[in-house]
Structure formats: C-alpha cells, structure tokens
C-alpha cells in the first residue's frame, strides 16, 4: 500500500461483502476475520476481541484497515459492561507485544446465538472503554453463521451495508495466533503458518 494514487494505496487482493456505500470504507484482513469466526469453542457462549489497525484519508474518503485482534476477558453475566478495567489492561499489554504499531479501531463479539439481549451492555461498554473515533463493532453468530459490521455514531449503532476482506501477509496476527495455540501444544511443534492454517480450517 505504498504506491502513488488511490489504487496504489489500497490492497489489491480483496473480496467484497455486501454493498459498499458512504464515505467510510472498512477493510478487514483475512487472518483477523477468520480468527473472529472460529475462536468460539463448542462449550462457550461468547468471546470478546479488541480490534486493531490504522486509518487513511484517501481522496476525501476514510479507509479503515483492521489487521489485528486481541481477546479481552469478559464476564457473560456482567450487568453493566461486557469487559472491565482489568481485562482492558491485559489487552493493552498483549497489543503492545504483538501490535505495537497499530491503534484501537473498535471491538468484536463472537457468540453462539443472539437470543440474549446485550444491547445495553454493548452500548455501555462502547461509551466507557472506547473513544468516539474507535467506533467499529463486529458481531458474529456461530449458530447460523451470520455476521454484521457496525459503526457507533451519535450514540447509535449503525449497521454497514458492506465491507471488504483483504488478503496480505500478516506476521503480527500469525504470531498472536501462535501464542494462543502454544498454550495447548509444545512451542517446537507449532509455527506461524501452521497456526494460521488451523484457524482457517472449517
């Protein structure tokens, strides 16, 4: 993304999801979206991730590039917010280790189903832990494999009609996934490509 001109600054290998509209364009890197879709295990109800990346203003349009994600510990039964100060502190430590050059873009939830109404907790979490410019929110429901991308603006959560998935080498995200896998396996048995393939397997 270093050539001159708009097209030279955008990823070349992309896949469009839905219809793209408006002056804010969202690009989710493939390793990140795969991680969000496959992180939940059969015995879990929900996982929460903080999204990292960077933004570029190109020809009066704001482009969001999300190429990092760090899991945040949460309490499913927490009444006020989904995460707390302690989990946020741990996320910052992990992000400093694996994504030192990226900034917070927003967050994501992967959960089993949508029967539990979390709207109040989601909005409260957004207000308490994220700045107005950290407004991206992604949700994936594993039971029916549906997903949606939102922007929090003016106190509301607005669903986007479309976004892009892009494909690039992403060593930082691969290294983070390796760190998760090696909790269950010996480090010498795992490398970045192997871990990435495991997350991509359906």
Task: List where the protein language model places each region.
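N-terminal beta-strand/alpha-helix entry module and adjacent surface
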Residues: 1-106, 111-195, 202
